[in-house]
Amino acid sequence: EMPLIEGLIAIGPQLQKEYPGKKLLLIANMDSNVRDIMRREEELRKYYAFAFPSLKIIEDTSDKAKFPLLAAEHGLNVPQTLEIDFSGSLEDELAKLEQVNQPFPWIIKPATSAGYERLKWPGKAKVYTVSNKEEAQTLLANLYQHTHNNPHARRFVLQPRVEGNDSFNLSVTAYVDQNLRVTMLGSAQVLLEDHSPTALGNPVAMITEPYPRLYEQVSSFLKGVGWHGFANFDFKVDSRTGIAYCFEVNPRIGRNSYYNTSAGMNPMRFFVEDVVEGKAIAPQRLGKRVYYSILPKRLVLRYVDKQMGKKIKTLYRLKKNHDPLFYPADFGFSLRGLKRFAYVMIARENHWRKYHRNYPVAKFRQGETRSLDTAALTQP
């Protein structure tokens, strides 16, 4: 069932009457919504204008076993990946472990969420970490047993864990127009992620900066697969080797895409020029450094090293800091404005409690506390 899509189709004629001669733009920032839109593309295009990759590209890139093959073919660096397929015998899949020549720990996770996410058993997780071959064998045997009657949940991938704290994560946002031109590329270093269970992994503090060599990889991949629309890439630099690996690409604009606007490059401009105006806009690459965060500065400083702390303080001093929730026009002298201001300030301060509960400083200090120095990545 796709109630959202059915609703969009049902309301389409009414919206066209309300806005005659106007293009109705359809944007999504959930992968599931993008898939549903492209499954009903022909019906939706009667009323709406949108830009997404084909359904095949979406499905291939969201499959964690297929994506590494596609990435390698088109110049995108990914971790070594081994597919585990339980459609055959368990013994054959366990024998594949001999092919892995990477150090422990290893990560094991479902190739696709479809099918797997509906299963329940004690100890089930979205991602598993194993510290030796015996643990890997035990886990695979357990997964084989619990997915036995579910053919859509029997494929997994095994990868070496890429080491590094939150600051070793990088975000790249791209837009590809209908002529396969990568018109926009923006990026940022993640300093701190959300560690609450319902929002785990979402960046909450970032510094924007260009990564020319990653831009080359991203452009090669997007052109090679025939992408159209927004793409959001997640990279991580291995703290041991300094090599940047791509973990996934989402066929949509990211939740934190406002970091691009903060740095002077509004992603919506590229979308509108392509889909509404049909113009071949000149390609742009992000160049400005700004600090983007929804957290109190003092809280973030607890989770970065001294060098990174100096960068943050310098950007504050230069007034190059942005909080997407802190919009002065929302805080007018009215009851509504005062309520909005109170909500934003309370939400900011509430992060102290959330991090104390979910990611205390003591836990951060148990691992590597060095922040990633991105100087090499910003060079052409």
Predicted features along the sequence, with ranges:
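Phosphate-binding site of ATP-dependent enzymes
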Residues: 131-195, 209-216, 237, 244-245
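Active-site nucleotide/adenylate-binding loops and adjacent lid/helix of ATP-dependent enzymes
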Residues: 60-156, 179, 213-215, 380
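Peripheral (often C-terminal) accessory segments that flank ATP-dependent C-N-forming ligase machineries
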Residues: 272-380
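Conserved metal-phosphate-binding beta-hairpin within the catalytic cores
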Residues: 222-258
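Flexible, glycine/charged-enriched surface loops at secondary-structure junctions
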Residues: 152-157, 230-233, 281-286
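Oxyanion-binding "anion nests"
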Residues: 197-200, 208-233
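Glycine-rich phosphate/pyrophosphate-binding beta-alpha loops
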Residues: 192-203, 250-264
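Conserved N-proximal alpha/beta basic substrate-recognition cap immediately N-terminal to
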Residues: 1-88, 92, 113-118
